[in-house]
Design a protein with these regions (language model features):
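Generic detector of short, aliphatic-rich beta-strand segments that form the cores of beta-sheets
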Residues: 1-2, 161
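Binuclear metal-ion centers of metallo-dependent hydrolases, dominated by the metallo-beta-lactamase
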Residues: 143-164
Length: 164
């Protein structure tokens, strides 16, 4: 089914049965280059888009995007087109995956990610870490204190940030 139709049907059901309810959509943001996807996401109350790293190599390790032309820059440029009407959600983690070190909590990673958050200017940021078992036992949950320190840096940009 066409994604826009799913969103339209959801909004119609909400309007008919629970008009006060908010509709939220969490997207991995890899299809933001598609006009229909952007239009559909603009129509919901809470458009939550993933951005787990400022670097293509790290994003590929964490998210395994299937498109060979995937780039963080392309995703960020599309996010900027929402003019702040979005929430950015980021999962912080570290460990080893597929014999490669992955860690989006280093100063280099966090500083670059913060620069992108400053460019995007979302209405809110959500940061979290692993909360359940993963298929890869070598990945580690980031302590809440570290997540809170990252959130404080986001808030210094004038953007509200929640820690889960």
């Amino acid at each position: 089914m066409y994604k826009r139709q799913i969103i339209d049907d959801t909004l119609s059901l909400r309007d008919a049965h629970c008009p006060g309810a908010k509709v939220s959509v969490l997207s991995n943001a890899t299809q933001l280059h598609r006009d229909g996807v952007r239009r559909a996401l603009r129509s919901v109350d809470n458009n939550i888009l993933k951005l787990d790293s400022a670097f293509d190599a790290t994003a590929r390790l964490i998210n395994n995007p299937q498109s060979p032309v995937y780039s963080v820059r392309r995703v960020v440029d599309q996010m900027k087109g929402f003019d702040g009407h979005l929430t950015v959600q980021t999962m912080f983690l570290r460990g080893e995956f597929d014999r490669q070190r992955v860690d989006n909590t280093t100063e280099e990673e966090v500083a670059a990610w913060l620069r992108l958050i400053g460019e995007i200017r979302p209405r809110q940021v959500m940061v979290y870490s692993l909360d359940r078992d993963t298929p890869c036992r070598t990945l580690e949950k980031v302590p809440r204190e570290e997540l809170q320190a990252i959130a404080t840096r986001v808030e210094a940009l004038g953007i509200p940030c929640s820690v889960a």
